[in-house]
Amino acid sequence: MTELSKYRNIGIFAHVDAGKTTTTERILKLTGKIHKIGEVHDGESTTDFMEQEAERGITIQSAAVSCFWKDHRFNVIDTPGHVDFTVEVYRSLKVLDGGIGVFCGSGGVEPQSETNWRYANDSEVARIIFVNKLDRMGADFLRVVKQTKDVLAANPLVMVLPIGIEDEFCGVVDLLTREAHIWDDSGLPENFEIKPVPADMVDIVEEYREMLIETALEQDDALLEAYMEGVQPSIEDVKRCIRAGTRTMAVFPTYCGSAFKNKGMQLLLDAVVDYLPDPVEVDPQPLTDEEGNENGEFAIVDVDAPFKALAFKIMDDRFGALTFVRIYSGRLKKGDTILNSFTGKTERIGRMVEMQANERNELESAQAGDIIAIVGMKNVQTGHTLCDPKHPCTLEAMVFPEPVISISVTPKDKGGSEKMGIAIGKMIAEDPSFRVETDIDSGETILKGMGELHLDIKVDILKRTYGVDLIVGEPQVAYRETITKEIEDSYTHKKQSGGSGQFGKIDYTIRPGEQNTGFTFTSKVVGGNVPKEFWPAVEKGFKSMMNTGTIAGFPVLDVELVLQDGAFHAVDSSAIAFEIAAKGAFRQSMPKAGAQLLEPIMNVDVFSPDDNVGDVIGDLNRRRGMIKDQNAGVTGVRIKADVPLSEMFGYIGSLRTMTSGRGQFSMEFAHYSPCPNSVSEKVVAQVKERKAAEAKK
């Protein structure tokens, strides 16, 4: 078993195409985990092992790989860069202790890099910066360093300087040791020499070395004071200070190279060992009560403590059902019985494996700090806590974003329904941001996701992985409804047709609620006009109607109901009568309270070459976008805008056309906003048309 101080649980994350997966491949090659390097552009990379990943050259799932470097165990997670798969980045960050942020040497800080960086900041994950692709046309290491300061508000600590640039890039100077690492053109990582600093770089190396040491020593007042008085610190002292600053995110050690050409990778791996924290150095995960509130206890990373682990990913592959877990405390052995604190059920551990992407090694045991996969677990989902049955506990839960886009899918043949149902069940377990429901009116299966690419991939998996031939509907926007004014109203439910009748009268106030509160209910009834035992029925009845608004049948947001008074009948009143009264009150009062249709607004971040900025901004304006910010860079302009999701379908194609393929964008959900009347009328008409068509079937 590896000592905890020698564990490094790290993620690699960046913008699409900055070279995350290639960087991971090189790490595996250097650590001896793979013999033939797989290239993303050949569809052969080790961590991109889904068909869809290999074909599209992007990472969709977070693949966990274990490897060793200088007696240290690395558990490496290669995360997606595409915005539709940020849920994978989020849940990876939940179980990581450190990370490598990869940036393109020519593209710099691109839209999705910023999103992932923000997520990592929120999760307080220490990081190293790696500026990749310095062999590319237009690469500029120091420009990208400046962008990380200006755009990400990071404090990059330059550890190396490149020797040459673009097609003349051949190596790096290690500022601490004042040594030049120079590779030949064979593309083999081991083919390098250590030489003195090139004569034309001596001055700039000394300048940046002095900045490096001064910044590092800010972590230790005594060393800094001695340095100011002329005492040179040892390299070990400087490294210790850098490690302390990295752990608190005061600095981000910054390296550069070309992963594709195998240049600069060894220094990056050394930096993971030297500067990223081990599991014990990271703040322990909080434990919570049944309501999800922190209870003041923590999952201390300790091999001898009771077992605690978080299931952070479920995957069904050719090996069977795999549950990826991060072990925080204790040990786990084959044959052990563990408790799922969410379900309250125990399970016996049959097989455990250590993953090398799509290969795996059988394990007899695992311990705190490990990221492993358990084979064949039942009734476990992402975010569930697994623990010692004698010491039950719950780790802080994962929260996933709500889907903003949906499509309908129907099997082409009758026999496909059962196959599709089984497949979708597995896919939901694997991806918490993927939701499925059945349309009440049409009976169609509705897939919901985070964006067009997200759902494209899901449909592709259904067709190719599970062999379900599908008819796919047009993408639909997740509209919502709300109210705009406060009204007082009254509703009576009365039914008498022989036997015992039904009677319930409620007087109430309905008003717009605070944003993101959903539905809130309070009662101000004094006396016995509506007995207290019927109040929950009123709340239940009204709340049950919130899923279907009165404008176009979309879910309703942020409504407050106050029960003021009412009346009941000693014989005919019941909970069901008051529940029905509340449902009738909803239908009656929503239009009176100024019911309004809401549409999802997206934060859109676009990069445009200088020549195309006018076209791109004009196009965003036509899409009802509101431009919030423009920042000129060396290679183009970053434009930030709020744009309705309904206007963003097919945007990537339009952007590529306008910019000759050079434009890039990312988007994420921002908030709901009232629809203009013209849009509202169009949406209502489309809903009526669809329902009429379904009625004829």
Swiss-Prot record:
Cellular component aspect of the GO annotation: cytoplasm
InterPro entries (UniProt xref): EFG_II, EFG_III, EFG_III/V, EFG_IV, EFG_V, EFG_V-like, EFTu-like_2, G_TR_CS
Protein's UniProt keywords contain Nucleotide-binding: yes
Positions of the tr-type G domain: 5-280
MF-aspect GO terms: GTP binding; GTPase activity; guanosine tetraphosphate binding; translation elongation factor activity
UniProt KW Thylakoid keyword: no
Pfam families linked: EFG_C, EFG_III, EFG_IV, GTP_EFTU, GTP_EFTU_D2
GO BP term, pick one: ribosome disassembly
Subcellular location(s) of the protein: Cytoplasm
Annotated GTP binding sites: 14-21, 78-82, 132-135
Keywords on record: Cytoplasm, Elongation factor, GTP-binding, Nucleotide-binding, Protein biosynthesis
Function: Catalyzes the GTP-dependent ribosomal translocation step during translation elongation. During this step, the ribosome changes from the pre-translocational (PRE) to the post-translocational (POST) state as the newly formed A-site-bound peptidyl-tRNA and P-site-bound deacylated tRNA move to the P and E sites, respectively. Catalyzes the coordinated movement of the two tRNA molecules, the mRNA and conformational changes in the ribosome.
Family listed: Belongs to the TRAFAC class translation factor GTPase superfamily. Classic translation factor GTPase family. EF-G/EF-2 subfamily.
Protein name listed in UniProt: Elongation factor G 2
Gene source species: Shewanella frigidimarina (strain NCIMB 400)
